[in-house]
Structure formats: structure tokens, C-alpha cells
């Protein structure tokens, strides 16, 4: 039978699923993250070989990865081809993976909110527009790393309640010098910053159990407001340009820039938003608050990880 292997690779881990021609999931597993920007060919081949001792060789391999730019595609393609000499290999970025997982072959605005953040306007086949996310130093509004950054700023500058600072230092077992060192001297500061988010999520859940006027609820509310602010910036800095573009007339577009194609009106103007990632999953309430209540943009779907959606997408693609 024809097998398809789907790999979804983030910076921390790679999820794998082997599916049959009927769309049944034969096997799932995960292995460490594969990022062509940070890893050598040998490293990547090692990861692929270690884990993928498959009983059945796939006929097709679909690889979706963070750090897979157009320039990186040929390299990733050849590494996968070495690992699966018999298979037809397709390599795509994680943004198209998210769009396919969320919307299949329908149009929509697809977003990733995990350690980093990204978004695109998707027409059901291709990414039509992609606001550059710029990473956690220059951008990545609403991401885990940026929320961690805002949190540390708040506890050390004193704009968040002092009780939160005490609780976080106890929870993490870290002190001020160690934190500064992790952010400025050690590698992978973005992962360290994002690792604060489970604590933030826990504090909000805890606070909601307490009555009005309690310190716990006060702490939770201050964190909730911090998250709302970051999601608001994610919306304004990234999504507004897609919403404007879709609503713009052909005349408006031609004035904007030469060579920019107008949005296909048959796809509709009121697109729904879709989100993939742990931050969207854990902070669904403030996310819906900003997108739906504030800006009247409907969220169609929030997926913690894209794999289920990718399996559905590739099961529908016959042959």
C-alpha cells in the first residue's frame, strides 16, 4: 500500500506521522527539532536516521519545518532524499504547514503562536502575503518568547505585583543574575523566555479560583492584561495588512504597488482566523477576547499542534 510520511518540525521537536493511502495513521512518534539554520547536514541526517527505522518505506514524504526558507529548501530536499531514496519529497515552511492544517484548501488568515510568532494570508493553495515576524528581539508579538520578555520586564521593574516576582523566582529556582545570564549570555534565550509561559498560565488559572479583591485574582488580572496587550500588537502589526488587502479594490491595489495582484473576490472578504501553537492553545481566552470581541474577527480553529490537520489534509490529497 502507498504510505505517506508527514514531518512537522519546530525548533524544539519534530512530530512524525506515517499514513496509509486510506488516511489511517499507521505510526506516530517524535524526535528532536530539525532547523536547517542551526544544524549541519550531518546533524540532520543523524536525527532522521536515528528515529526513522520504518517497517515500511514511504512513497511520499512531506516535510514542514521552521527555518525552511526558499533558500533552504533544496538543502532539506536533498537530505530527505538521501534518507528516503525511493520517495517523492516535498519540503515546505511551517507557515504553509499551519495554513494547510487550519484551512485545508479554503482561504483564511493562518497564524502561529508558539515560542515564536508568524502569520500569513492563505488563498487555499498558496501564501499570498506574509508579514515578516522579525524574531523575538525585533518582533514576534504575542509569542511565548515575547510574553516571557514582558513578564521579566514587569517583575524586575515593578510594574507587575511583587508577589508574582517572589512566586516566579521560587517556581523557577532562579535568581536575578542567573536570569540575566540566561537571556544575554547563554544560547537559546528565546526558549528560556518562552519557558516562563507555563508559570504565567498557571497563575491565571489559580487566580480565577479566588474572589474579587484577593491578591491572587489581582496577580492573574495583571498577567491577563499583559497578554491582551501583546495579542493586540500581534493583531495590529501583522494581521491588519491582510484584512485591508482583502477588502481593497483592484484600483486601490494598483495604486499601492506595481505587480501586486488583487485578492480574488470569489474567495470572499470576511476571512476567518486560525491559530496553531501552544500559546494560542493555553491563552485561548485572551486571544478570543482581542480577535473576536475587540476586532470582530472570527477564530475558526485553534490547534495546539498542526499534525492532526496535516494528516487530514494529506489524506484528502489522493495519489
Predicted regions and their residues:
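Short, solvent-exposed loop/turn elements at beta->coil junctions and helix N-caps
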Residues: 66, 96, 184-185
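ATP-binding/phosphotransfer module of carbohydrate and carboxylate kinases, centering on a glycine-rich
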Residues: 1-60, 79, 83, 102-109, ...
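Cofactor-binding loop segments of dinucleotide-utilizing enzymes, especially the Rossmann-like FAD-
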Residues: 66, 115, 278
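Polybasic, low-complexity association/targeting segments
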Residues: 62-69
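Phosphate-binding/catalytic loop of phosphoryl-transfer enzymes
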Residues: 69-166
